[in-house]
Regions:
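Cytosolic-side membrane-insertion boundary helix
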Residues: 392-422
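Rossmann-fold NAD(P)-binding glycine/threonine-rich loop
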Residues: 101-127, 269-322
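Glycine/serine-rich phosphate-binding loop and adjoining beta1-alpha1 elements at the start
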Residues: 2-5, 11, 82-172
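Adenosine-phosphate binding glycine-rich loop
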Residues: 121-163, 170, 294, 300-387, ...
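Structural signature of hydrophobic alpha-helical transmembrane segments
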Residues: 437-448
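Glycine-rich phosphate/diphosphate-binding loop of Rossmann-like nucleotide-binding domains
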Residues: 9-47, 159-253, 406-413, 435
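An N-terminal-biased, well-structured beta-alpha scaffold segment characteristic
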Residues: 2-109, 113
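A structured beta-alpha segment of the ubiquitous adenosine-cofactor-binding alpha/beta core
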Residues: 57-69, 79-80, 227-260, 264-277, ...
Length: 451
C-alpha cells in the first residue's frame, strides 16, 4: 500500500506567521506512518528553517502548486483562499481553520469537489478532544499576549512598588470574560503583580477566577444562566435586564481601571458590545483597552480591526486580530501538536492510512464536508450517562437481633473500660514503687481533679 503524504503550504493570508507543521510534529507524524512535505519558507516567520525540516525528514517543495499536487493530507492554519480552493481535489483531506459558519461558498465548493474538510475550530469541547482543541490553544496564547500588549502601551508598572523615589501604586486590570483567553489573561496579569478583577456571565467560573488570585465581579442580579458545558464553554445570550445590570457595573468600574481586556464571544454571532463610549470616556488618560473580540466585531465601541487607536481622552484601544500570530513560534508548536493528535485519531492502526470514522464524536464534529456532502453543522455530542450503582436496601432486623446487637455492644464497651482501668491501675502502682511520696500525693490530687 502506498504511504500517504501530509503537506503544509506557506500561509497566504497577509501577515500570518504561523505554520501548521513544525520539525517536531513532523517526526511524530512519521511515526504514524506518513511521509511529510512542506513548501519552502513556510516555517521561516515562525523560526523554523528549511534545513530544520530537512533534518527532520521532511521533503521541501519549491512551490505551493507542487505541494498540493503531491500530498494527500493538507494541514493549514488559515481558511483557504480562492486560489487554494482551486487546488483542492477529491483525493485531499484538508485540516485547517475553515470558518464553516461564515464560509458557505467554501463548504459548497469543497463538497462539490468531494474533498474531506476537517475544521479545527469545530473540534467538540469535550474532555477526550482537549488535545485537539486548537481554539483553546490559540485563545490561551491570545490571552497571554493581550496582557503583554497592554503592558507595552501602559505607562506604568503592573506591580506596586515602594522606592526611594516614591510609591508606585499597582495597576488595576479588569478582564471581561473568563473563558480560556480570559483565564490566561488573569494568570498573566496576577503574575505581573496587578490587582486583577474578572467578570463573566457564568457564575460557575468564579471559583476558577478566585483560585488564580483575581477578584470576581458579582452582579446584584438574579438570572438563570446556562452552564458553560451546555454552550461549549462560551457565554450564552443574556436578557435585556441582565445586560443593563452588567453595563451599570462596568460604568461603576470604568473610572478605577487602568487596563481592560475584553474576551466575550458568542458562537456564530457578532461579539456583544460591552464597553461603550461613555465607559471609555470615564477611564483615566493613559489607560489601555485590549479587545480580543475584534475579529467578531469587538466588545468595545471604538475598536478598529487590526489597528491601535487613541480616544480623545487619551485611552488606547488595541484591536489587533493576530495575537496568536504575534507569538508564531509558540502558536505553531501548539497548533501543530493539535494537528498531530487529530491525525493520531484518524490513523488508529498507525499505518499511514486515514480512517475517517464518522461514528467518532470528535471526527464527526470537526468534519464539515465528507463524501461530497456538507456535514456542517454537526449533531450534538453524545453524552454517555454513567449509570448509578444500585444501592441494596438495608435488611430490617428483628427485635431479637436488635437486642442481641445491643448486648454485644454493651459487652464490648464494658470489656474496653475494664482493660483501661486495669492498665491505669498497674501504671499507677508501678509509678508508686519508684516515685517519692510527695510526688504521688500531688499526682493523686491531679487525677482526682481531672475526673
Amino acid at each position: 500500500m502506498t504511504t500517504l503524504k501530509i503537506g503544509t503550504p506557506k500561509e497566504v493570508f497577509d501577515g500570518e506567521a504561523r505554520v501548521a507543521m513544525t520539525p517536531d510534529s513532523a517526526l511524530q507524524l512519521q511515526k504514524l506512518g506518513y511521509d511529510c512535505a512542506i513548501e519552502s519558507g513556510a516555517g521561516v516567520l515562525a523560526g523554523f528553517s528549511d534545513k530544520a525540516y530537512s533534518e527532520a525528514g521532511v521533503e521541501i517543495k519549491k512551490t505551493a502548486a507542487a505541494l498540493w499536487k503531491d500530498v494527500d493530507v493538507v494541514a493549514k492554519v488559515r481558511e483557504p483562499d480562492d486560489g487554494e480552493m482551486k487546488r483542492l481535489t477529491a483525493d485531499h483531506t484538508l485540516i485547517s481553520f475553515f470558518n464553516p459558519a461564515g464560509n458557505d461558498k467554501g463548504l459548497q465548493a469543497a463538497a462539490k469537489k468531494g474533498a474531506s474538510v476537517i475544521a479545527m475550530e469545530m473540534v467538540p469541547r469535550i474532555s477526550r478532544a482537549q488535545k485537539m482543541d486548537a481554539l483553546s490553544s490559540m485563545a490561551n496564547i491570545a490571552g497571554y499576549r493581550a496582557v503583554i500588549e497592554a503592558g507595552n502601551n501602559f505607562g506604568r508598572f503592573f506591580t506596586g512598588q515602594v522606592t526611594a523615589a516614591g510609591k508606585v501604586p499597582p495597576a488595576k486590570v479588569l478582564i471581561v470574560g473568563a473563558g480560556v483567553a480570559g483565564l490566561a489573561a488573569i494568570g498573566t496579569s496576577t503574575s505581573l503583580g496587578a490587582i486583577t478583577y474578572a467578570f463573566d456571565v457564568r457564575p460557575e467560573v468564579a471559583e476558577q477566577v478566585e483560585s488564580m488570585g483575581a477578584e470576581f465581579v458579582y452582579l446584584d442580579f438574579k438570572e438563570e444562566q446556562k452552564d458553560g458545558a451546555e454552550t461549549g464553554g462560551y457565554a450564552a445570550v443574556s436578557s435585556p435586564e441582565f445586560r443593563e445590570a452588567q453595563l451599570a457595573k462596568f460604568r461603576e468600574l470604568a473610572p478605577e481601571m487602568d487596563i481592560v481586556i475584553t474576551t466575550a464571544l458568542i458562537p456564530n454571532r457578532e461579539a456583544p458590545k460591552l464597553w461603550l463610549k461613555d465607559m471609555v470616556k470615564a477611564m483615566k488618560p493613559g489607560s489601555v483597552i485590549v479587545d480580543l473580540a475584534a475579529p467578531a466585531g469587538g466588545n468595545v465601541e471604538g475598536t478598529v480591526q487590526d489597528e491601535k487607536v487613541v480616544s480623545d481622552n487619551g485611552v488606547t484601544i488595541v484591536g489587533y486580530t493576530d495575537f496568536a500570530s504575534r507569538m508564531a513560534a509558540q502558536a505553531s508548536s501548539l497548533y501543530s501538536t493539535n494537528i498531530r493528535h487529530m491525525m493520531t485519531d484518524l490513523t488508529p492502526e498507525k499505518d499511514g492510512v486515514v480512517v475517517h470514522n464518522m461514528e467518532d464524536d470528535v471526527i464527526r464534529g470537526a468534519t464539515v464536508t465528507f463524501n461530497k456532502e456538507v456535514t456542517f453543522p454537526p449533531p450534538p455530542p453524545k453524552v454517555q450517562a454513567i449509570a448509578a450503582k444500585s444501592q441494596e436496601k438495608p435488611k430490617e432486623l428483628t427485635p431479637e437481633e436488635i437486642r442481641a446487637q445491643e448486648a454485644d455492644a454493651f459487652k464490648a464497651q464494658t470489656k474496653q473500660q475494664v482493660i483501661l482501668l486495669a492498665t491505669g491501675a498497674l501504671l499507677t502502682l508501678g509509678l508508686g514503687l519508684i516515685a517519692p511520696v510527695s510526688f504521688m500525693q500531688h499526682f493523686i490530687v491531679f487525677v482526682l481533679s481531672v475526673f
